[in-house]
Amino acid sequence: MNKVKLKLFYIGLTLLLLQSCSHKMSYSSITEPIDDKKVIALSGQRFPWVVEIEQRLKNKGFTVLRYSSVQKVTEKAPDKDISYQQASARYVVQLNGFAPLEWAFRCMGGGYKFNYISAEVIDTKTNQSIYSFNDSGYSENCPPVSGSIFTDLVDGINGLWKN
C-alpha cells in the first residue's frame, strides 16, 4: 500500500512541476482604453490553434478579419481633392507560435502544448505595438495539466478596448 501512495505522490509532484514550467508575460503600452469598434485583423500562419483564438475573440464581440485590406479613398472638396489609403482594420494581431500538431503530441482533450506563443497588437495608424503577449506550456483542454493560454491572450486583447 505504501508503494502505491509513493507512486501517486511522485506522479502528482511531476504534474505540478510540469504545470509550473509555463512562463507568461504580457505588456500593454496604452494609457487610455480604445474607444472604437472591436474590429481586428489576424496576421500569421493559419494553424488550427489560430481558429481557437479567432473564435474566442468573436465570443468577446470582435469582428475578426483575416487580412487588413486597404482601399483608396478620395474626398472631394470645392478647392481640392484629398486621396488616402484607408485600412479595413486599424488594429492587427500578429500571431506566432509553435505547438506540435501530430496526434502523438496533442493533448487528449484537444488542446495544445506550446513551445512558445506570442501575439502583438499593432495600431496601423501609428505603427506602434500597443500590446505584447508571450507564453509557453499547455493550453486549455489538456487535462490534467490544462493551462489558460487562449483565455489569457484573448482577455488581454479585450482589455485594450473600452467595454
Regions found by a protein language model. Name each.
Residues M1-H23:
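Sec-dependent bacterial lipoprotein signal peptides
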Residues N2-K3, S26-I30, P78-D81:
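A generic local structural motif
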Residues L18-E75:
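A structural "domain/chain start" motif
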Residues S22-P33, R56, Q128-N163:
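C-terminal/domain-edge helix-coil "capping" segments
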Residues S43-V50, G110-Y112, S139-F150:
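Solvent-exposed, acidic/flexible segments
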Residues V70-S132, S136:
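Surface-exposed short loop/turn segments
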